[in-house]
């Protein structure tokens, strides 16, 4: 399709007319239009146009100054749009469709909400559902930028040139003012720049009024946003909600047990944590009465920059997967699959090349559960871009390989672990996965853990029948393999065959495992154990320490580790979080295991309010912290996500 012509517009316009100025509705969908085909000089003649359909084309941007000031309905679905700021030229827009533009993210949705205060519907849904989210973000950013302005102005000397100082302020605000999740950083920095420039402009108008410093006017008042979050592409068979109902529970003050001072073993002082948010975001049918949905797994999104840390966590349970910002407690995304029960989630980061040759970083979330399907979610764009029919039975757990960002392990109740290569999305932004290996197990695999020192060579799994290891090197000819070594945790006739339902590497050598003995978590050396195996198929682990845990006989409480901080975490049957600082063991492993070590501290269940009563007790199925240990997320058996923050 070449450039548009007046004749084509009259052919596809309604009502039929030989004058462009009388057309009120125009359908330009499916014409393979490029951005340069939209001629502002031609389109501005559509002075009465109220409805425009540009769906199913190849548009990367919308030209400025199209002159369609009366436009009320705009459809831009299934294009290649990467920016939405040009939409501000349509101040009367009421309905907007943007689904199927894979490079638009939640940041663009928020920009749309801010720029178009008259919007009523986005992608066919009520656009006012997330009003409070954008409003709260804007209010907090305005407050922080204003405080930064006052601090900045107080440091200026009288001799400093005002123009240069004000330009420096805008740069420093964009660099230093932070709020909200990393996934919203594009929107927040965009707003910070706008607010900063408004403050600078306001200060210039006041220079002649007074010499004494005054508090800057409320920034952004002329652009009070309508906070509406647009939901992007949704598969027809699996609805996606980007504006889930979120129920926060008020909580009395939490009780924390454990000494907050340095121990005699030389460990660091215990960190202080406080409960921040309690969310019911996995409720069946979005019912606030649901205190029964079991939540099973959570994982923090990988940081976008090396050395940084993430505050965005994915949680799963029931028929929903949620992505939550730990700082604000906002549910950023919610993916629902009716009839599914999600058991596991895992993140990876992929570099995708667009049709225009640009590179984009995608955070991809894999989620799986009862139906044996793996769903690959492009979280920031908000849609499912692939489904792997991985197993005929339920998937208990999954994880990505640290060595290969596209390699995904899935472990199922069919007693198989399969290694997949999910690849990178094609031009239609769909994954085409291929199967690389099948690993047979003698019992149901519960936890997967690539060996930290050689993740592309060995895989550990905690199973109903014990702890096993497989050779996963891809340069070997066999594509179906059995367990190479089984690890046992004690001597005697009952040494093997015991469930291992918790497994994590604390560093490249030391493994934390749970389930082999009641009331204990075992720390053992991979290097020493593997080095002493010889040709044996059953090997006793070299135990370095045993950590005291709950004496419950209940199973399936998953443990996790925070390697950067030398911390091991595990929930229990009463809603508590057991925290162990094992940094001293990592620095100097003991020659012989010492006596059972007590936890560094126990975070007692804070007993939040729900349905007008206190939730006095629950089971914490899993607990995970981000790399810097600033946030901790605990998932319960009673549909409550508990988020703790470091004080």
Swiss-Prot record:
Keyword Phosphoprotein: yes
Matching Pfam families: LRR_LRWD1 (PF23211), WD_LRWD1 (PF23215)
Principal location listed in the UniProt entry: nucleus
PTM annotation (Phosphoserine): residues: 212, 243, 251, 259, 264
Gene3D superfamilies xref list: Ribonuclease Inhibitor (3.80.10.10), YVTN repeat-like/Quinoprotein amine dehydrogenase (2.130.10.10)
LRR repeats: 22-43, 48-69, 70-91, 92-113
Cystine connections: none
PTM note: Ubiquitinated; undergoes 'Lys-48'-linked polyubiquitination leading to proteasomal degradation. Ubiquitination occurs within the WD repeats at the end of the G1 phase. Ubiquitination may be catalyzed by the CUL4-DDB1 E3 ubiquitin-protein ligase complex and other E3 ligases.
Subcellular locations according to the entry: Nucleus; Chromosome, Centromere; Chromosome, Telomere; Cytoplasm, Cytoskeleton, Microtubule organizing center, Centrosome
Residue ranges of WD repeats: 282-335, 341-379, 383-422, 426-472, 484-526, 542-582, 598-646
Function per UniProt: Required for G1/S transition. Recruits and stabilizes the origin recognition complex (ORC) onto chromatin during G1 to establish pre-replication complex (preRC) and to heterochromatic sites in post-replicated cells. Binds a combination of DNA and histone methylation repressive marks on heterochromatin. Binds histone H3 and H4 trimethylation marks H3K9me3, H3K27me3 and H4K20me3 in a cooperative manner with DNA methylation. Required for silencing of major satellite repeats. May be important ORC2, ORC3 and ORC4 stability.
Domain-level remarks: The entire WD repeat region is required for the interaction with ORC, CDT1 and GMNN, as well as for association with chromatin and for binding to histone H3 and H4 trimethylation marks H3K9me3 and H4K20me3.
Protein name: Leucine-rich repeat and WD repeat-containing protein 1
